[in-house]
Amino acid sequence: MWLCPLALTLTLMAASGAACEVKDICVGSPGIPGTPGSHGLPGRDGRDGVKGDPGPPGPMGPPGDMPCFPGNDGLPGAPGIPGECGEKGEPGERGPPGLPAHLDEELQATLHDFRHQILQTRGALSLQESILAIGGKVFSTNGQSATFDAIQEACARAGGHIAVPRSPEENEAIASFVKKYNTYAYVGLTEGPSPGDFRYSDGTPVNYTNWYPGEPAGRGTEQCVEMYTDGRWNDRNCLYNRLTICEF
């Protein structure tokens, strides 16, 4: 039975003109493809490829649980542009009541006394010779002699006026200068329109006198008053030079 395929094969070979020798391999035309075989086993992993480009940023993650420490203060910025004026505010609350008026008056009186004392001291020191304070007055002399009018001018320049006693204590204070310099001194009295009527420089009548017995005796010819070394008074011509004594 196997002789039939062999005879068929020989017949095909003879028809195609192919020579066949017993000792050589005959090459025929390709046969019909067979059915695909089953998949083989997976191969081994290949080598790492080249590093790719960075991908886009991912979405922001949730806040962390650990707080961060604040950083250092930055440099001060440049001054900003002045802003517009704001609206007028509401009136403030009423302040506490001020001091009573009488306290202010007392303060003014105290300041006036201080000012007066300063002027007294400044004027007395300007004479720079002898100073004596009696009550609210300061008597001072520069030790120089002059006429009545010249003494008035000198005392006025120093901020005072020619000394005039208005009490026994003040008379004794002026007399102490007269005794010290052993000379007479004018006091601030002048004769009025009537002979023997002596008054203060402001024109008011004299309320204290210490005349030497029999004085005043000039009867209108001696219109000033001088003090002796014992403190007694005598009317005298105003052109004589007498010790300069001022009061402040």
Curated annotation (Swiss-Prot):
<keyword id="KW-0430">Lectin</keyword>
<keyword id="KW-0964">Secreted</keyword>
<keyword id="KW-0305">Gaseous exchange</keyword>
<feature type="compositionally biased region" description="Pro residues">
    <location>
        <begin position="54"/>
        <end position="65"/>
    </location>
</feature>
<dbReference type="InterPro" id="IPR051663">
    <property type="entry name" value="CLec_Tetranectin-domain"/>
</dbReference>
<feature type="compositionally biased region" description="Basic and acidic residues">
    <location>
        <begin position="42"/>
        <end position="51"/>
    </location>
</feature>
<feature type="disulfide bond">
    <location>
        <begin position="155"/>
        <end position="246"/>
    </location>
</feature>
<feature type="region of interest" description="Disordered">
    <location>
        <begin position="33"/>
        <end position="100"/>
    </location>
</feature>
<feature type="binding site">
    <location>
        <position position="234"/>
    </location>
    <ligand>
        <name>Ca(2+)</name>
    </ligand>
</feature>
<dbReference type="GO" id="GO:0030246">
    <property type="term" value="F:carbohydrate binding"/>
</dbReference>
<keyword id="KW-0767">Surface film</keyword>
<dbReference type="InterPro" id="IPR016186">
    <property type="entry name" value="C-type_lectin-like/link_sf"/>
</dbReference>
<dbReference type="GO" id="GO:0005581">
    <property type="term" value="C:collagen trimer"/>
</dbReference>
<dbReference type="Pfam" id="PF00059">
    <property type="entry name" value="Lectin_C"/>
</dbReference>
<protein>
    <recommendedName>
        <fullName>Pulmonary surfactant-associated protein A</fullName>
    </recommendedName>
</protein>
<dbReference type="GO" id="GO:0046872">
    <property type="term" value="F:metal ion binding"/>
</dbReference>
<keyword id="KW-1015">Disulfide bond</keyword>
<feature type="domain" description="Collagen-like">
    <location>
        <begin position="31"/>
        <end position="100"/>
    </location>
</feature>
<dbReference type="InterPro" id="IPR016187">
    <property type="entry name" value="CTDL_fold"/>
</dbReference>
<dbReference type="GO" id="GO:0007585">
    <property type="term" value="P:respiratory gaseous exchange by respiratory system"/>
</dbReference>
<feature type="glycosylation site" description="N-linked (GlcNAc...) asparagine">
    <location>
        <position position="207"/>
    </location>
</feature>
<feature type="binding site">
    <location>
        <position position="235"/>
    </location>
    <ligand>
        <name>Ca(2+)</name>
    </ligand>
</feature>
<keyword id="KW-0479">Metal-binding</keyword>
<feature type="domain" description="C-type lectin">
    <location>
        <begin position="134"/>
        <end position="247"/>
    </location>
</feature>
<dbReference type="GO" id="GO:0005771">
    <property type="term" value="C:multivesicular body"/>
</dbReference>
<comment type="similarity">
    <text>Belongs to the SFTPA family.</text>
</comment>
<dbReference type="InterPro" id="IPR018378">
    <property type="entry name" value="C-type_lectin_CS"/>
</dbReference>
<keyword id="KW-0732">Signal</keyword>
<dbReference type="InterPro" id="IPR033990">
    <property type="entry name" value="Collectin_CTLD"/>
</dbReference>
<dbReference type="GO" id="GO:0005615">
    <property type="term" value="C:extracellular space"/>
</dbReference>
<keyword id="KW-0176">Collagen</keyword>
<keyword id="KW-0272">Extracellular matrix</keyword>
<comment type="function">
    <text>In presence of calcium ions, it binds to surfactant phospholipids and contributes to lower the surface tension at the air-liquid interface in the alveoli of the mammalian lung and is essential for normal respiration. Enhances the expression of MYO18A/SP-R210 on alveolar macrophages.</text>
</comment>
<comment type="subunit">
    <text>Oligomeric complex of 6 set of homotrimers.</text>
</comment>
<keyword id="KW-0325">Glycoprotein</keyword>
<feature type="binding site">
    <location>
        <position position="217"/>
    </location>
    <ligand>
        <name>Ca(2+)</name>
    </ligand>
</feature>
<feature type="binding site">
    <location>
        <position position="215"/>
    </location>
    <ligand>
        <name>Ca(2+)</name>
    </ligand>
</feature>
<dbReference type="InterPro" id="IPR001304">
    <property type="entry name" value="C-type_lectin-like"/>
</dbReference>
<feature type="signal peptide">
    <location>
        <begin position="1"/>
        <end position="20"/>
    </location>
</feature>
<feature type="disulfide bond">
    <location>
        <begin position="224"/>
        <end position="238"/>
    </location>
</feature>
<keyword id="KW-0106">Calcium</keyword>
